[in-house]
């Protein structure tokens, strides 16, 4: 990357700015610039797109996205220690990198979105990644403001995102993701690619919006999945008792003796629409 974009190696940047990844912020810096390019390429063509990035840290992934020709990157970073390193990248790519200091969970990404295609590419902080994904999945209006999500998670979370019925990893997250998006796991990233190395393998997942997901009220689907998977080993007649139990299941045409992990996304939507 240094040869490609003319910027110093990331290890030098981190040392010069005294940056150490902080566990409280869910940080693990990705220093392998071949990997950051691979992540950016997973999002497809970037030339016409504005990219949202969360938690850029010292900017390894940011640099890859810009070097691959993204029209603009809007990066949200709450760690003020990283801002000088990101400012150097902004100077190197005039007018193409905007850094917003703040908490991504409190950021209205849709309000920040300019005209044209939007893609979200991020090595998400482990402690907020799942909540950010759910926020992006559950706007009332659909299709969403974004064209695709290319995100890094702990592998266990990635497996939950892409899981479908009769899979041990299947749960509320798999239903919400499968309802509104097409999902795939792109590739794994070993712990040694990060500083400091996490204790687990990470994985990159890619999600694209379904044009016409099954009509279903977001709040009702959340209620049903939360109740069903809250007691996932119990029969649905028992786990869904607070929502109507057997009466609800009969109305939806679903056998009350089944368990949550056997239901397809379509059947969960049937239940939500029967509330």
Swiss-Prot record:
Q: Which NCBIfam families does the entry mention?
A: ksgA
UniProt organism field: Rhizobium leguminosarum bv. trifolii (strain WSM2304)
| Keyword Cell cycle included in the entry's annotation | no
Q: Which SUPFAM superfamilies match?
A: S-adenosyl-L-methionine-dependent methyltransferases (SSF53335)
Chief place where the protein resides: cytoplasm
Protein name listed in UniProt: Ribosomal RNA small subunit methyltransferase A
PROSITE patterns the UniProt entry points to: RRNA_A_DIMETH (PS01131), SAM_RNA_A_N6_MT (PS51689)
HAMAP family named among the record's database cross-references: 16SrRNA_methyltr_A (MF_00607)
Recorded catalytic activity of this chain's protein: adenosine(1518)/adenosine(1519) in 16S rRNA + 4 S-adenosyl-L-methionine = N(6)-dimethyladenosine(1518)/N(6)-dimethyladenosine(1519) in 16S rRNA + 4 S-adenosyl-L-homocysteine + 4 H(+)
Keyword NADP present in the record's keywords: the answer is no
List of residues binding S-adenosyl-L-methionine:
28, 30, 55, 77, 103, 123
Q: Signal sequence: where? A: none
Places the protein is found: Cytoplasm
Q: Which UniProt keywords apply?
A: Cytoplasm, Methyltransferase, RNA-binding, rRNA processing, S-adenosyl-L-methionine, Transferase
